[in-house]
UniProtKB/Swiss-Prot annotation:
Keywords: Carotenoid biosynthesis, Chlorophyll biosynthesis, Photosynthesis
InterPro entries, A to Z: Homeodomain-like_sf (IPR009057), HTH_Fis (IPR002197), PAS (IPR000014), PAS-like_dom_sf (IPR035965), Tscrpt_reg_PpsR-CrtJ (IPR011785)
Pathway membership: Carotenoid biosynthesis; spheroidene biosynthesis
Protein name: Protein CrtJ
Amino acid sequence: MTSDGSFLMRREALQRVSPDLLADIVTSACDIALVVSPGRVVESVMVNPQFGSAERFAAWQGARLSQLFSPESAQKLENRLADGPEPGRSLQLELTHAADAFTLPVRYTITRSGEDGTLLLIGRDMQPLAEVQQQLVKAQLALERDYEAQREIETRYRVLLEAHPAPLLIVSMSTGRIADLNLAAAAMIGATRAELIDAPVGQELDGRRRGEFLENLAKIAGSDPLGAVELTIRRSRRKVTVTATLFRAAGDRLLLCRLGEAEARRTRVDDTVELSERLFLKGIDAMVFLDADGTIRAANDAFLYLTDAGSAALVQGRSFADFLSRGAVDLNVLLDNVKRIGHLRHYVTRLNTDFSGQVTVELSATLFHDRATPTIALVIRDSNLADATRIMPGMASNEGLRNVMQMVGYATLRDIVSETTEIIEKMCIETALELTGNNRVAAAELLSLSRQSLYVKLRKFGLLSKDAE
């Protein structure tokens, strides 16, 4: 024996072994063996009886070696044989036999004879290993499908839970802790969802001890699905009613609890919500809800009628500046004032219609900042008819205009028009300052004047000292 554990045998001793016995030894040590001439022609095929019958591979004898393999395996074999093996050394390759009737993966140990270059290919059938690998791949694919199905179910569950308008809690009967809840329930309790997950339900809902509370809910869920328990939310001391549904999941009993307002409060809230919805849908004044950046979230039919819009879908998502005659200037004045003081009254402007028309309107705005996303509500009225009734009394009460009226018959028309122009100019500047909350930069934008021109006119009409006061 050599140092690496292999055995040495003299050639003379090996020659004393009969060829038939040597063939039996080779076939018993492998599944299939090929003897290939230097010209790459198969001279002999030896098959282990447990692997298959020799007739199955009889056609291989006399065939070219490359014809026995798939094109990829034949090319791989040629490339490796071009580089080796050296006589007395071997190389291992995994090759695939591709015949008309079958495909056979085999791992070959290839040895080259030192005398004439004859090749001996000793092969082991890789079909069992390939089948195991295929089963592993199928199992992996099945696991991935199960994982995707589980994710889909979890997504559907989460969407259903969050889309339900009622506050919902899922409570474990064994631990008395909150297993899950939707955002509506978290908002009603007055905490975040992360704070309430796995929190003891008895610490959030005050009424009875934990055991009595859960047993009472389970009893109601089993006997009267419409029954309810009145409890108090500890954080806000708010009265709520709790209805429950009992179910099992993963061996644990769970309660699906629906939180609702106490009856008296719920009746008042429901009435208010219903009346508000009716006012929005059927009111004669146009109503619009905006995001904080001026994007339209909702608009009623009166607004669609006022702007000649075809449908609410064509309005939602557009900037309200698209409907203002002064565009972004009007919108910035509106948003700045509403965000600063929370509301805006009697803001007069013009709305553009979808057919290049304009309507003079008066709008009021209110900011709802106590929501997750701040919302601005607008009430818009057509002021074309009201202008005539409002302007004349104002004109009669304005000292400058009364003086102009008294000039008729005592001054030329040119002088009267010049005096009127200055009065109207002063009134416009005062109105712009009032609308912008004395913000001169915004007033200049509103009047399409430069800041320098506005200051000149303020000094001209004595409004600088008035603003300082």
